[in-house]
C-alpha cells in the first residue's frame, strides 16, 4: 500500500483491495510460482503452461471474491478495479460508469460468435483477466447465493463465470487432435520467450 492509494480510494474500495490481497494469502495462490516454472531448465508441457496462465486468471477471480465479500458493495469494487487498471483516480478526469464497464463484456460476448477460434493469442499469456471481465464476474458473484439469500446457486455461477473467462482462453486447451497438440507446443515456446524477455512474471503479476 502507498500513501497515494490511501488518499485516492474510499473506505469500501480499500476494503476490496485489502480483502483481495488477503484472499491470495488464504487460498495459497503464491505457492505456485508461475514465472519460475516457465523459466526453468525443463520447460513444462504446453498444456500445463497454458493451464498455468488460465489458473492465474482464475486465482484473481477468487481473490476478487474475497475482496468483494469484505467491501459488500459492487459499485465500490468495480470502481477500485477501474482505478487500479487505469491509474485514473480523479473523477474530474474520467467518471466511472458501472453499466458502461459491464457493457464492454456483453459486446465481447456478442462478438465471440466464431466457434473454434478462441481468444487472441496475446490474451492466453496474461496472468490477470481484463478488468471488465473481473467486474462482470463479480456482478454474478453478488447475484449468487454466496452473497444473496435468493441468488443463483454456485454451479450456475461457476458456469457463467467460465463462459466469461473463456474469452481469454484458446480452444486448443481442450483440443485432443495432433494439430491442437502442435499448437500448444508452439505457444508454450512463445510463453517462455515472453517470460525471459521480461525477466519472468513481474511482482505485480505474481501478487
Language-model segments: what does each one mean?
Residues 5-15, 22-38:
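Catalytic Zn2+-binding segment of zinc metalloproteases
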Residues 20, 63, 130:
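Divalent metal-coordination and catalytic microenvironments
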Residues 24-25, 66, 70:
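Short alpha-helical functional segments enriched in proximate histidine and acidic residues
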Residues 36-46:
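A short mid-domain helix/strand-loop element embedded in enzyme catalytic domains
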Residues 44-55, 68-159:
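Active-site-proximal gating segments in proteases and membrane effectors
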Residues 57-59:
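Conserved phosphate-handling catalytic cores of large alpha/beta enzymes
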Residues 64-68, 191-192:
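Amphipathic alpha-helical segments within well-ordered protein domains
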Residues 131-207:
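Non-catalytic terminal regions of proteins
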Amino acid at each position: 500500500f502507498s500513501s497515494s492509494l490511501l488518499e485516492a480510494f474510499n473506505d469500501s474500495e480499500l476494503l476490496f483491495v485489502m480483502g483481495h490481497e488477503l484472499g491470495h494469502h488464504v487460498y495459497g495462490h503464491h505457492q505456485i510460482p508461475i514465472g519460475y516454472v516457465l523459466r526453468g531448465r525443463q520447460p513444462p508441457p504446453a498444456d500445463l503452461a497454458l493451464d498455468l496462465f488460465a489458473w492465474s486468471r482464475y486465482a484473481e477471480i477468487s481473490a476478487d471474491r474475497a475482496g468483494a465479500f469484505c467491501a459488500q458493495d459492487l459499485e465500490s469494487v468495480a470502481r477500485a478495479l477501474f482505478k487500479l487498471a487505469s491509474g485514473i483516480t480523479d473523477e474530474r478526469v474520467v467518471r466511472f460508469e458501472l453499466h458502461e464497464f459491464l457493457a464492454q463484456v456483453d459486446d465481447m460476448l456478442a462478438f465471440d460468435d466464431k466457434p473454434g477460434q478462441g481468444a487472441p493469442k496475446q490474451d492466453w499469456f496474461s496472468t490477470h483477466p481484463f478488468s471488465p471481465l473481473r467486474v462482470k464476474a463479480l456482478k454474478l458473484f453478488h447475484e449468487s447465493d454466496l452473497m444473496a439469500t435468493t441468488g443463483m446457486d454456485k454451479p450456475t455461477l461457476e458456469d457463467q463465470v467460465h463462459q466469461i473467462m473463456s474469452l481469454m482462453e484458446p480452444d486448443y486447451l481442450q483440443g485432443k487432435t495432433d494439430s491442437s497438440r502442435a499448437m500448444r507446443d508452439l505457444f508454450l515456446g512463445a510463453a517462455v520467450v515472453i517470460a525471459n524477455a521480461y525477466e519472468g512474471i513481474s511482482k505485480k503479476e505474481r501478487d
